[in-house]
Amino acid sequence: MTTIFDAFKLEGRVAVVTGGAGLLGREFSRTLAEAGAAVVVADIQAGAAEAVAADLTAQGYLALGVRLDVTDPALVQAMVETTLARFGRLDILVNSAALDPKFDPEALARGIVPGRFEDFPLDLWNQALAVNLTGVFLVTQACVQPMLAQGKGSIINICSTYGLNGPDQRIYVRADGQRVGYKPVYYTVTKAGVLGFTKYLAAYYAGTQIRVNA
């Protein structure tokens, strides 16, 4: 039976997925592996990254788990070097790492309401900019180097509809009538930034074999 993977075969390609052990990152990693790519599962949680990679390997796929803090240029460069040392190339980058208030234990522990702007802490704002925006810049800057050397590559930035429109807090109401804060200010701001970054790079690499999408 013909499957979608027959149209999108990735044998011989190497993909890096940042946030690869996260809710979305795990699925991106699995799908790329099923399509035939060797997958580098890069995540700030080293154990989780290794577990995802081990699961893929147990299924017969090529995968490697690597610890990556996208805000640390040295760790970003080390991840690229590890990828090249293990697989010899780097063809695909999926920028999936991001802070999301639903899964941010620090924010939850501090009792921060995701949608409340008036008292949103500056330190969490700065942290989100560092991870969600600067991290995408740093990882892309490092990964595009081997792509340029190879003459082709694909960069995929995970964005959101909230990068185009802010969440209307009025529609997020529980059955008991209590309004629930949904997505903090940084989420829309950083996702809009990622979209702008994608447009810039798509135009910048126009005419080359480097493709940039969101």
Task: Please annotate each region the language model reported.
Residues 160:
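Residue(s) in the substrate-gating loop at a strand-loop-helix junction
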Residues 37-51:
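Conserved glycine-rich Rossmann-like NAD(P)H-binding loop of the short-chain dehydrogenase/reductase
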